């Protein structure tokens, strides 16, 4: 490999890319945004992806009239894409550390990193190095998207303009030209994005940390180490917003240069947010001297479940840190409509409410979901196993759920676990349409009732992703609603 020039990441500005050779690895959502941004700022971009041009037709079309050098397909040697570059930019799923990265690319990247001549930077890391605005990073195993969205809503009730993005599906790199020091940027950050960070956010918010993606990180300890990276990277004056109800997160400490604000579903201390007497409460150090600390009644939180109380606590803490008035925070939370595929209320008819929690791919998330509902509950679950234990899930389901309809590859595993835990009514379905139909029949036996899709499994055995699974659920519910209208 030829000795490449390099871009100095220290003091990086938007003009640093002009006439510089830059490689982009991966042409999915993040890679498309990187390619457009770099090309628009004068870089000579090379794009590498193992998929063919035919497979990437929509992605290539999304580049518009930009004409990067495209090295596409399984026959391309990734070393060719990395040769003579000033900078290498990676998509979230690409890293020399990940066993899930294509082996040849992983090896070629490792060689570049070992040589130390050319910076390798992710889209999020590049954004944070260039961003002039205050930043809030949100991470955890579950609850990231809802908490990020709540924080954006709460900050939006203040005076500063707010931008939301990151793992929530909106790459932020293309938003850089419009950002100023007066903006607030909220980034949802996944375990894919954290290991490659070398620049932290001004505030690091943690929901909770259990276990997930062990195929990529190898062990629970390695996964947890990745998750705490956002706290480790806090800058001078940075703030860790820490969930003290979580046994892992509550043990996190901050560097001497930063400070911490905690939240928990219990009475708050001076520099924390908590719950007391049916209210979201802020400690004395979090609110003006003439304020009694009461922010919002728990009964006014529009999204169900104790875990969503925790999410509101985190958002409240961030809002107060940025000077949003307590009354404005309360109004923002009361008006929060929730997030698609996360305990999303889809419809209510014939005495049955339908809830889409397709993003509930992990047992812990489903436990929280079933505990969010009091009345007659029918659960739709199943999919591709994530290799996580289901005993605690089975106990919660047997305690809180009247019946389960199972589908997908984990049907037999979940049926055995639920039966052993004492659940008597277990049905099976071969499609989402059949699952919703069967669940509806059971739910109508005792109304009011709730049908909850919360799979406790990945979607890839039957769907492209959890979003496609959620859309299929909503379509099936719409079909049942239409049948109900016709029968009247």
What residue spans do the PLM features occupy?
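N-terminal leader/targeting and accessory segments in enzymes
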Residues: 1-122, 304, 483
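Nucleotide phosphate-binding/pyrophosphate-handling subdomain across enzymes
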Residues: 5-21, 33-41, 295-402, 416-419
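Residue-level signal for inorganic ion chemistry
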Residues: 38, 88, 138, 167, ...
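Phosphate-binding loop of NTP-binding sites
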Residues: 39, 79-85, 92, 96-244, ...
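Short internal beta-strands
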Residues: 43-51, 241-244, 378-381, 400-410
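Beta-strand->loop->alpha-helix junctions that form or flank phosphate-binding loops
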Residues: 46-49, 71-74, 119-125, 165, ...
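C-terminal helical cap/extension that packs against the catalytic core
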Residues: 66-67, 391-449, 487-488
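Short, conserved loop/helix-junction motifs that constitute active-site signature segments
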Residues: 197-200, 230-236, 253-256, 372-374, ...
């Amino acid at each position: 490999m030829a000795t490449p020039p390099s871009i100095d990441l220290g003091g990086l500005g938007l003009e640093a890319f002009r006439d510089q050779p830059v490689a982009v690895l991966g042409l999915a959502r993040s890679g498309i945004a990187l390619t457009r941004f770099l090309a628009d700022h004068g870089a000579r971009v090379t794009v590498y992806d193992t998929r063919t041009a035919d497979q990437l037709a929509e992605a290539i079309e999304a580049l518009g009239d930009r004409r990067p050098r495209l090295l596409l397909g399984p026959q391309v040697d990734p070393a060719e894409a990395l040769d003579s570059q000033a900078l290498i930019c990676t998509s979230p799923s690409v890293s020399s550390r990940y066993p899930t990265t294509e082996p040849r690319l992983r090896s070629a990247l490792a060689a570049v990193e070992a040589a130390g001549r050319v910076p390798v930077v992710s889209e999020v890391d590049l954004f944070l190095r260039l961003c002039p605005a205050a930043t809030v990073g949100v991470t955890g195993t579950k609850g990231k998207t809802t908490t990020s969205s709540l924080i954006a809503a709460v900050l939006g009730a203040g005076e500063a303009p707010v931008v939301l993005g990151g793992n929530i599906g909106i790459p932020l790199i293309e938003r850089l030209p419009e950002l100023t020091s007066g903006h607030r940027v909220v980034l949802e950050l996944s375990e894919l994005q954290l290991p490659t960070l070398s620049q932290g956010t001004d505030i690091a918010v943690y929901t909770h940390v259990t276990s997930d993606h062990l195929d990529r990180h190898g062990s629970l300890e390695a996964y947890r180490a990745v998750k705490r990276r956002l706290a480790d990277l806090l800058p001078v004056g940075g703030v860790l917003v820490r969930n003290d109800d979580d046994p892992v997160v509550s043990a996190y400490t901050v560097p001497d240069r930063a400070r911490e604000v905690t939240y928990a579903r219990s009475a708050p201390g001076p520099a924390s947010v908590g719950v007391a007497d049916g209210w979201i409460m802020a400690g004395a150090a979090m609110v003006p001297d003439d304020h009694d600390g009461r922010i919002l009644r728990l009964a006014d939180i529009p999204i169900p479940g104790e875990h969503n109380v925790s999410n509101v606590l985190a958002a409240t803490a961030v809002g107060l840190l940025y000077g949003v008035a307590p009354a404005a925070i309360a109004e923002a939370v009361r008006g929060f409509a929730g997030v698609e595929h996360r305990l999303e209320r889809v419809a209510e008819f014939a005495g049955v409410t339908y809830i889409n929690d397709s993003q509930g791919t992990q047992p812990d998330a489903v436990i929280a979901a079933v505990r969010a509902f009091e009345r007659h509950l029918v659960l739709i679950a199943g999919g591709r196993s994530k290799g996580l234990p289901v005993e605690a899930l089975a106990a919660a389901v047997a305690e809180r759920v009247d019946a389960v309809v199972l589908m997908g590859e984990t049907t037999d595993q979940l049926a055995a676990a639920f039966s052993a835990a004492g659940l008597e009514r277990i049905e099976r379905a071969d499609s989402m349409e059949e699952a919703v139909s069967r669940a509806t029949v059971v739910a109508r036996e005792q109304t009011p009732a709730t049908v909850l899709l919360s799979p406790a499994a990945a979607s890839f055995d039957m769907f492209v992703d959890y979003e496609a699974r959620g859309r299929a659920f909503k379509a099936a519910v719409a079909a049942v609603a239409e049948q109900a209208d016709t029968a009247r």
